[in-house]
Amino acid sequence: MYKAPKMRFAPRRIAEIPFRGTIAAGVFNTLVSGRIAYPFRITEVKMIFTDDANNWIRHGWYVGRNRSQPTTGPPTGVNIFGRESPVADFVGKAIIRVVPCNIEYPEGGMIIHFYTQNSGPYAYERNASCTIEAM
């Protein structure tokens, strides 16, 4: 009788970091996560564009080591999707945009920045999340 070896699977540490808040008309704004002390990989980002986004809302995802929240443009740090595409921001209307990815940050101490530019005439309620997995 053959007995298969026991397989051991380490539990995966997965977290979904929410980003939510109102942004006034005609401004830039950045929301930041807490410091992520361990090595991680970003596995998915999700952005909800409502009907009133009307392609006026532009989102971008950045990582860096400081908690800067500039009000005149994108945050300092590296655009997460900048190495994958020359156009690394997301624009939409009436869509839930889910972007699966596998972007690793082997050093700890990073902070995720969710950047929004509202070019429209109205305030906008933004809603997004970033899913990370410990490495």
Name each model feature, range by range:
Residues 1-135:
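Beta-strand-centric surfaces of beta-sandwich/beta-rich domains
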